[in-house]
Amino acid sequence: MARTPIHAGEILDDELKESGISAKKLANIIQVPPNRLYQILAKKRSMTADTALRLSRYFGMSADFWMNLQSAYELDLARQQLGKAIQ
């Protein structure tokens, strides 16, 4: 049974809940359009290096953490979609 890939938006949602801050307020603090965070939270947008750097500063995590989440998500999706087609 294939595992469900974890999008960076799921982790961001957890971090927002833990810190008690809204996506809109965080967007203002890290100086990005709120829609960017809303789209990441909805799994409709990928994590970018710019956003990863800004989130890392706010949450005290490395930017690599956020980028690795994105990379792992994309690889998991590719594995599921391509299955055994690539040998």
Where are these regions (language model features)?
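The DNA-recognition helices of helix-turn-helix-type DNA-binding domains
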Residues: 33, 44, 59, 70-73
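The alpha-helix within a helix-turn-helix
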Residues: 16, 27, 56
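Short, basic-rich loop-to-helix N-cap that marks the start of a DNA-contacting helix
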Residues: 44-57
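Short, charged recognition helix plus adjacent turn
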Residues: 65-87
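A short, Lys/Arg-rich alpha-helix, primarily the initiator
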Residues: 1-21, 68
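Short, contiguous, well-ordered secondary-structure segments
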Residues: 15, 38-41
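Short alpha-helical DNA-recognition segment
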Residues: 21-39
